[in-house]
């Protein structure tokens, strides 16, 4: 599965390199959502809430009101906030360091995604700004019991469009008893296809926003034509009527 990402800061969709260097900002957030939702779930991340510099909560509520399947992340640090987003229509909530808190067990496990944000092998916190001193590998087992999936982000690769650190990705996917979504450095359809073969999903941002990766190509890359005995799933549409 591909999961396009809308990272929000000051009411705009933004992309940062390595979580700190702004690259672009766009105001057409709702148009992006309408496009991205065609491929399945969309990740909407409140960067301001994650870094403690503000909030895009009102905008996220409006996005959820469209009925699009959205996983919400950024700044969710207590049970009330997590429940509020789920009640507002979020398909899932993405939790960072808060995933270690006891209240997390009161949430529906299948609607919780735990963010494993890593610089190298170290888990980072506070919107990727600080190191925790903990190794990602040591967290997978204990945190897997609290969630339905992990979001593994390679912070050093985020926004760089220089490829994925495959040995680390493969190690995390292999060690995890729950599904893993990978983010950071995913640039080509081949990257998406390789993740699919590993059994992982691809959360994509910078490559899509800059036009380096076409979402249709990324979607098709997940299809294993060999398994279908030459059959290809299709959706047909009348060019004249649009039906």
What are these regions (language model features)?
Residues 2-8, 42-44, 70-74, 93-95, ...:
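Hydrophobic faces of well-ordered beta-strands that scaffold small-molecule active sites
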Residues 6-22, 83, 90-158:
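Conserved anion-binding
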Residues 18-36:
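Short catalytic helix/loop segments, enriched in acidic residues and glycine
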Residues 25, 54-61, 129-138, 162-171:
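Charged helix-capping and loop-helix junction motifs
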Residues 41-55, 59, 152-161:
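Glycine-rich, proline-tolerant flexible connector loops at the mouths of alpha/beta enzymes
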Residues 58-60, 65-95, 102-104, 167-202:
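Catalytic cores of alpha/beta
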Residues 102-114, 192-221:
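C-terminal helical cap(s) of enzyme catalytic domains, especially alpha/beta-barrels
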Residues 129, 136-137, 207, 212-243:
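Flexible "arm" and connector segments at domain edges
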